[in-house]
Amino acid sequence: MEDDDQQKAADLVQELVLRLVSQNPQTPNLDPNSPAFLKTLRYAFRILSSRLTPSVLPDATAIAESLKRRLATQGKSSDALAFADLYTKFASKTGPGSVNNKWALVYLLKIVSDDRKSAINGLDSSVLLPNLGIGDTGNGVLSRGEAKKKDWSNGVLLVSKDPENLRDIAFREYAILVKEENEVTEEVLVRDVLYASQGIDGKYVKFNSEIDGYAVQESVKVPRATRIMVRMLSELGWLFRKVKTFITESMDRFPAEDVGTVGQAFCAALQDELSDYYKLLAVLEAQAMNPIPLVSESASSNNYLSLRRLSVWFAEPMVKMRLMAVLVDKCKVLRGGAMAGAIHLHAQHGDPLVHDFMMSLLRCVCSPLFEMVRSWVLEGELEDTFGEFFVVGQPVKVDLLWREGYKLHPAMLPSFISPSLAQRILRTGKSINFLRVCCDDHGWADAASEAAAASGTTTRRGGLGYGETDALEHLVTEAAKRIDKHLLDVLYKRYKFKEHCLAIKRYLLLGQGDFVQYLMDIVGPKLSEPANNISSFELAGFLEAAIRASNAQYDDRDMLDRLRVKMMPHGSGDRGWDVFSLEYEARVPLDTVFTESVLSKYLRVFNFLWKLKRVEHALIGIWKTMKPNCITSNSFVKLQSSVKLQLLSALRRCQVLWNEMNHFVTNFQYYIMFEVLEVSWSNFSKEMEAAKDLDDLLAAHEKYLNAIVGKSLLGEQSQTIRESLFVLFELILRFRSHADRLYEGIHELQIRSKESGREKNKSQEPGSWISEGRKGLTQRAGEFLQSMSQDMDSIAKEYTSSLDGFLSLLPLQQSVDLKFLFFRLDFTEFYSRLHSKG
């Protein structure tokens, strides 16, 4: 069939030449078998077999538009419309009998039209392309003058002045010279470069370990420029080999080693890119099968592959492969979020090609990471087998689940997720787990579904991906808002967190006054005994009695049952006052707030307040003994005036010292109860209402407790002033002991003085004041009062000195409230003047 087509084409060419030559008046009846005609026919075949092409793009539509515009500018609008209609019909005709190369035919008609116009205008068309003709001369070509005289071109295609086609001969000689300088043809080198691009050694292009790359073997004779170009093109193979090796090694290590899901996704993304690369190489290999034409023929052939064309084809794959090789080097020792973050840094690029490529790669790589975020935020599930997520879980006790159960792993936090967003992600998942594990609550599922609906995402897998950071932040914000609100509602309503805080304030911080006073009254005598002789069960009975005798009996029974007596570790010399304390039992989930360390702080505050209450109770006891109606001066009329003066002086000294101590204790207790406890509670209540999540609640409670500890002089920085305060407490308790002895002695002296006249014979016991008579009574009374006065003076001096030291330390404290305490204690500047005189 192909031979028939060729013969048909040859016959058509012969007929065309015969008709053209027959138009020459000199040869009207030319014999087709004559030597002159055969020479002309061979010349025509040389023209047709040449590679000469026009210097315009093969665009039929452009040629047609050019012709239509030309007709329109010449004022031939009707011809332009007719041409446009004819061309539309011509271009739309397809199938058998239609012209395949429509552009060539339209271009031919254009050239014929231009040639005829040139002939009409008297131009020498042979100047452009001499006509094909047969003359009488020996070479068979008409002279230029004859052609002009005869003027018979009539639009015949004119060829160059090179009837012997010398340019084609020169091109062929150049091709022969190139072949002599190269042992290997360019087609072979192209195929070898394609092999090298797949990491395979070719026949002449092989991997050279010395230069760490592919290159033409030194023994092969090729031009230096060709060798350099092959080396540059083969860089793609070196990069491919690097990427392919990384993928293979990573897959070989899985699942024995922790490649991780992000690492697997990275390998899958690289493999997808290599698959596209393989497709490109398949296309190039198909083109490489076509021979490379000569330089003179190159313009008419498109489906061949040379080294220069290969460099154009390799431009885009080279950029991508270089990026992949850089990422492979960067990610060899990375995994999880760290790997995703490292890849993300390379996506910040101004080149659209690089940016789009990295975005496509990151969408695949970050898919497992975003799935972990979705699962954690909406389900509280930590699906992280290989430790790739930036949230890390660890086994802990239930009470430590919120504080220590989950932490951020900064090394695994990708750079496209901000630290604040990571904290919200961490807290949201923690809230779900806290509700599920500690609160035994499942209402979080509805809150998570509402959050997903509000953010426009789905609760199913694949709902989020790289490049959707705003959508992720919106989802996390909505989920955190709803789940945290649900968590606080559960704590406040179901577990009565506020009520428990108030119960601790009433009983551990001694805010329930009647309960504290009654407990102090009934337990005080028992606590004066040695600690080893006191039973905790007996003290628990006292506690229950105090509850029943006060308004505490109307509180929630569950909260009262949590209040227990605790005996602290003690030695042989400790009294009950030193070891007695109350504790509050915190159960799940409240033990997340009231941890052991928090309860230990409450214990310290209770012990401090209990000491303060004990001192206040002691001063009240002294006042009850000192009431004026207990002692009348008429009872001592029979005593000597000196002894009576000693008695009045001792009583007055005792009352003055009591007033000083009572002034200090009253103002200090007012400061503790109102400016410390009540103010701190008021602030805590406001912050508790404003809390948006459990972290806010924990921070508010910690701030509340730290404020109490700091303002109550229980902090580490207040150790010196606290020791000074405890010295004052000890002096007040010593004063209580001496005051009791004084009034016991006075009471006995009062009784003996009344009975001295009536019962002289009844009180003859050895050592009795009365047994020695009135003189002896007076002497013993004087000695007793003198001793008590000395003790009172000693306590007064120590108290004044200690109080002065305490007041001097108050202005040095950081808390402003303590400075106001100084103003309350020394509002008349009595101690300041006393200190300045001293």
Curated annotation (Swiss-Prot):
GO terms for molecular function: gamma-tubulin binding; tubulin binding. Transmembrane segments: none annotated. Coiled coil: none annotated. Keywords: Cytoplasm, Cytoskeleton, Microtubule, Nucleus. Induction: Up-regulated in galls upon nematode infection. It is found in: Cytoplasm, Cytoskeleton, Microtubule organizing center; Nucleus envelope; Cytoplasm; Cytoplasm, Cell cortex. GO terms for biological process: microtubule nucleation; positive regulation of microtubule nucleation; response to nematode. Residues 200-256 are annotated as: Triggers nucleus envelope localization. InterPro entries: GCP, GCP_C, GCP_C_sf, GCP_N. One of its GO terms (cellular component) is spindle pole. Part of the gamma-tubulin complex. Gamma-tubulin complex is composed of gamma-tubulin and GCP proteins. Interacts directly with GCP2, GIP1 and GIP2. Belongs to the TUBGCP family. Gamma-tubulin complex is necessary for microtubule nucleation at the microtubule organizing centers (MTOCs). Required for the positioning of the gamma-tubulin-containing complex on pre-existing microtubules and for the proper organization of cortical arrays. Gamma-tubulin complex is essential for the control of microtubular network remodeling in the course of initiation and development of giant-feeding cells, and for the successful reproduction of nematodes (e.g. Meloidogyne spp.) in their plant hosts. This is Gamma-tubulin complex component 3. It comes from Arabidopsis thaliana (Mouse-ear cress). The gene is GCP3.
